[in-house]
């Protein structure tokens, strides 16, 4: 029985290895050289920890050199930590005069990782509460909320539960109810590709394969949009996480999925929010159908919408400058 099971596992692993997503040769060559290079510093602001519900939560606050127009609070997507934000995007926000705060969710980055999540599950509202505690520690009264994917859902929870602490809401490629039976569901074939990718590059554990896995994920997230992935930038950021932080928590994706399902629909509450809202979604998103953001734009009072051509479930490098200009205009409404 043991030998038979082992044979099955080997066969399945071989099939996944042969059929799973791969990356082009030029990306492999770039990754091979990056592994041997010196990793630059990715954390340039003031850092610290807060304690929220017995979790130690890591944050970074980057303040402009000149006058501060306001504060932007960033909420990252599923399985990612604070370092998932493109450096060029952070630099643009700070140059535009906005103090920019990013933080590691529970179970990611330098924040506490916990087992036994099933016994004491947390919700998206708890993640939003962690962000409020960070603002309290920095004596910041209000912030502009910007969330991507899962982060868009957390930002929505913040706007719903702490409206007096929110200036604006920007929800990017997200949903107000991810299991809405009246909307197209999350792309299951895409999820299968993610699983295949994880298996393909986890059979042999090495820094190179971790980098390859993350670059391949970015290529999958691009969908059928036509733009180049920043292989060097993604690889350097991942390598920094491996060598200078705690790496990646393999269990956090499941915990975050459970938090999403526990949180359920936010439609009723979103119909009542009063903060200016901007809804953004890529028209080539292979993961969350754009109809989810269309529903958000429909139910949030006065919400503005931007449907972006040639954008998947990621922020393309070539769009960072124009996206920053759009956001700064939105922020100026408050």
Predicted regions and their residues:
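Conserved HGGG/HGGXW glycine-rich cap/lid loop of the alpha/beta-hydrolase fold
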Residues: 55-113
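Conserved acidic catalytic loop of the alpha/beta-hydrolase fold
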Residues: 125-143
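Conserved hydrolase catalytic core segment
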Residues: 141-183
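Flexible "cap/lid" loop of the alpha/beta hydrolase fold
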Residues: 169-203
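Catalytic active-site module of serine/aspartate enzymes centered on a nucleophile-bearing elbow/loop
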Residues: 303-334
């Amino acid at each position: 029985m043991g030998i038979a099971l082992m044979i099955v596992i080997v066969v399945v692993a071989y099939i996944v290895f042969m059929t799973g997503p791969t990356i082009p040769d030029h990306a492999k060559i770039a990754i091979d050289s990056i592994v041997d290079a010196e990793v630059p510093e990715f954390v340039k602001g003031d850092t610290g920890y807060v304690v929220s519900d017995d979790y130690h939560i890591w944050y970074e606050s980057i303040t402009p050199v000149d006058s501060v127009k306001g504060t932007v609070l960033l909420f990252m997507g599923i399985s990612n930590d604070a370092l998932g934000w493109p450096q060029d995007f952070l630099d643009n926000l700070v140059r535009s005069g906005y103090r920019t705060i990013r933080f590691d969710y529970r179970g990611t980055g330098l924040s506490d990782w916990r087992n036994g999540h099933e016994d004491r599950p947390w919700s998206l509202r708890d993640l939003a509460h962690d962000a409020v505690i960070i603002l309290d520690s920095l004596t910041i009264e209000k912030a502009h909320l910007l969330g991507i994917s899962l982060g868009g859902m957390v930002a929505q929870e913040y706007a719903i539960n702490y409206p007096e602490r929110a200036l604006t809401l920007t929800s990017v490629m997200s949903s107000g109810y991810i299991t809405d039976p009246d909307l197209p569901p999350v792309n299951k074939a895409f999820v299968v590709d993610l699983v295949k990718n994880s298996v393909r590059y986890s059979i042999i554990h090495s820094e190179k394969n971790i980098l390859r896995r993350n670059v391949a994920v970015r290529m999958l997230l691009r969908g059928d949009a036509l733009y180049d992935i920043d292989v060097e930038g993604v690889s350097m950021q991942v390598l920094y996480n491996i060598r200078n932080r705690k790496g990646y928590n393999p269990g956090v994706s499941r915990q975050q999925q459970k938090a999403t399902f526990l949180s359920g629909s936010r439609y009723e509450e979103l119909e009542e929010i009063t903060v200016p809202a901007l809804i953004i979604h890529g028209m080539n998103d292979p993961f969350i159908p754009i109809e989810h953001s269309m529903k958000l734009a429909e139910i949030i009072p006065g919400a503005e919408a931007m449907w972006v051509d040639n954008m998947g479930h990621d922020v393309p490098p070539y769009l960072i400058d124009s996206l920053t200009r759009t956001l700064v205009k939105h922020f100026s409404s408050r």
